[in-house]
Amino acid sequence: MLSARTMKEVVYWSPKKVADWLLENAMPEYCEPLEHFTGQDLINLTQEDFKKPPLYRVSSDNGQRLLDMIETLKMEHHMEAHKNGHANGHLSIGVDIPNPDGSFSIKTKPNGMPNGFRKEMIKIPMPEPERSQYPMEWGKTFLAFLYALSCFVLTTVMISVVHERVPPKEVQPPLPDTFFDHFNRVQWAFSICEINGMILVGLWLFQWLLLKYKSIISRRFFCIVGTLYLYRCITMYVTTLPVPGMHFNCSPKLFGDWEAQVRRIMKLIAGGGLSITGSHNMCGDYLYSGHTVMLTLTYLFIKEYSPRRLWWYHWICWLLSVVGIFCILLAHDHYTVDVVVAYYITTRLFWWYHTMANQQVLKEASQMNLLARVWWYRPFQYFEKNVQGIVPRSYHWPFPWPVVHLSRQVKYSRLVNDT
């Protein structure tokens, strides 16, 4: 909280102080439009200012929340000024009192009244209490998790089903691929891909732990990753491609042995669907690449929900993602079209979802809103209807022990956001 002294000096705030106040009150979207505003400019804002650039498209509530916060700021400023000009809440007036030696001294009397105080009624506008712009709603997050888990299990089942349909490599050789024509296979490349993927997932999990609004963000992650794997179930089932290389040693077909298939599915789930764990030795899950999905999606979430000033962190994660995707092709474990389709679907679904989530008008179905025609629009409305505006990149320390300050003080309760 800002101190009373700081409140008193609000009119003298610099643009940097205004930006700090906006971040402190979870309104980072105003930092860029108001980057040159002083404290005096801030408290002079009116409803009309939000009907013209640069503020008319910043928030879906027409700036009402910011105006309410400014009213609170004015109220606290007024109370501090009133307190400093009055004694115990009442005006004090000095009068001359004669002394025995003929001189005069000044004696203060409350409100100028010789025998008591006169009450003053002050009308202070109080902003109406509002509910949180970013409710946690963990129940919805749990439903999104169940959806993602169901899609992952369904994908695993579908891999086992498709494996039975893959033609032997001796009968149906690999399809021609331009990348394979120019790059020879590197045996260890796929292990590098999976290691990079595990590093990115680990970084994202650690970053997620520090997020203040982790419920909303994880809900979005589960919805997107679940839908991507659901799409993957469809594409791999409708078109079964032959193995991309003669190096593949696919596990034997089971020919209707459902008990053995269940054991194989459980083994694949337990190993996370990774070849490096020895759990994935089935063929047929080519169109499109699940490894590309995770490498791309984890990078997109890491970049979207981390401070802009951590550009070096973004570049490291981007490099891990790009090298991992390149190694998929270098290992000849997926056709190039598998990677291209996976990248395209992942990025478009991520961008569409976040565009719709960040624009209040797109959360309402209408003739003009063509995005409302996607099949997952109703679930999207259910998960996002109570989230107002862009979710801040706000971090906090989630553990019971205090954080150790090394070089400079870091306040985890404040927004670490460079918009």
Swiss-Prot record:
Principal localisation: Golgi
Catalytic residues as annotated in Swiss-Prot or TrEMBL: 291, 334, 338
Transmembrane segments: 142-162, 190-210, 221-241, 282-302, 310-330
Domain of life: Eukaryota
GO cellular component assignments: endoplasmic reticulum; Golgi membrane; Golgi trans cisterna; nucleus; plasma membrane
Family to which this protein belongs: Belongs to the sphingomyelin synthase family.
Descriptive protein name: Phosphatidylcholine:ceramide cholinephosphotransferase 1
Protein's organism: Mus musculus
